[in-house]
């Protein structure tokens, strides 16, 4: 099973507003960057999209170290998800889970991989985290430019 390092980040200008996500996939000496964005979104949706795209892009089952600066993503998938599912996609307070569509997609994307979810402190000198931060912010700015030119 291939060992992949994945670095993910999401960015949103305004929250809600234009947003972007970015992924850096690394296998041995090979790297692949993935980016995308949406016109009207939130930072949490972009963080989720980055993780989803990292996992969905891999064509075979892999062992993955997924690095994210989002506690929302890391805690959601490792701590909260099982309770949400058990409660019919309700939080402990009984409210509907926000971003359920993306959480379900992320859950499905995890099924064929062995994943270690690693939290990285944002803006703290991790060069790969900084790299995806710049890419995600660039995608958010590109989305904002698209809105401004309409």
UniProtKB/Swiss-Prot annotation:
Provide a Gene Ontology MF annotation, just one: RNA-DNA hybrid ribonuclease activity
- Principal place of residence: cytoplasm
Q: Name one GO cellular component term.
A: cytoplasm
Q: What class of enzyme is it?
A: hydrolase
Catalytic reaction list:
Endonucleolytic cleavage to 5'-phosphomonoester
Stated name of the protein: Ribonuclease HI
Which species is listed as the source?
Answer: Xylella fastidiosa (strain Temecula1 / ATCC 700964)
Q: Which residues bind Mg(2+) 2?
A: 9, 133
Q: Where in the cell is it found?
A: Cytoplasm
- The residues that the entry says bind Mg(2+) 1 are 9, 47, 69
Q: Give the family this protein belongs to, as stated in its UniProt record.
A: Belongs to the RNase H family.
Ranges for domain RNase H type-1: 1-141
Q: Which cofactor does it need?
A: Mg(2+)
């Amino acid at each position: 099973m291939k060992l992949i390092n994945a670095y993910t980040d999401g960015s949103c200008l305004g929250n809600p507003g234009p947003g972007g996500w970015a992924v850096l996939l690394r296998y041995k000496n090979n790297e692949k960057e993935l980016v995308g964005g949406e016109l009207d979104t939130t930072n949490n949706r972009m963080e989720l999209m980055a993780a989803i795209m990292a996992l969905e892009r891999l064509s075979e089952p892999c062992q993955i170290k997924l690095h994210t600066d989002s506690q929302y993503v890391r805690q959601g998938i490792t701590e909260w998800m099982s309770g949400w599912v058990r409660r019919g996609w309700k939080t402990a307070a009984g409210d509907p889970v926000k971003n359920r569509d993306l959480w379900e997609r992320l859950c499905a994307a995890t099924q064929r991989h062995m994943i270690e979810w690693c939290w990285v402190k944002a803006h703290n000198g991790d060069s790969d985290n900084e790299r995806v931060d710049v890419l995600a912010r660039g995608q958010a700015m590109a989305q904002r430019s698209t809105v401004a030119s309409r």
